């Protein structure tokens, strides 16, 4: 995912003043004293995503990170004249592209983890009788939070209206000045989906060459199982500085 490039606040204010001046809306211009204060903050380094007075937040940089996907697989096979076997175990882990932190009572991170397995056993019970036992399955875990329209909210969030957090520990005040995506994605809860699928079959085969050459009889028993569960924790939605909007589900 490509990073976004943003103009700094001083440049934005100067461009805004130039735009309104072109329309002769002089009374809408930002005061030069405000621009000078911000310019001094940039010159002295007194600004940043956690600065109470001069917040400068690159929401994209704060939230978006490179994602990853991992896959592992192990196979074993072998056997004797009496029995042959094959077994396979796999694991897949798709990580999050958002830089979120696990909370005390829930995990808002987005991820998908899957385990899959397969085992085949073939027995030569006699010269004319064979038995096959096959087992396969997979189990998946998909976790996410309740944030929606994330990309649009990150792009639309104001970069200089409030910090991510104030020095007193409260979240930046998104209730009156916009939306705090770092706060919302980390604090509004999580939901975990668990899925399971299993396949089982047993096949018995008997050669009947004594009746007709190449004739065989076979019997097969199969069973399939599947389940899906969802567990969720939905907190109240925190919009900003000591501002709590209760929303439970």
What are these regions (language model features)?
Residues 226-235:
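Carboxylate/His-rich catalytic cores and anion/metal-binding grooves
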Residues 1-197, 203-209:
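Membrane-proximal, glycine/serine-rich, low-complexity loop/turn segments characteristic
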Residues 235-246:
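Solvent-exposed, glycine/polar-rich loop segments of beta-barrel outer-membrane systems
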Residues 214-216, 236-237:
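Short, glycine/acidic-rich hinge or "gate" loops at secondary-structure transitions
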Residues 216-225:
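Extended hydrophobic secondary-structure segments that form protein cores and membrane-embedded regions
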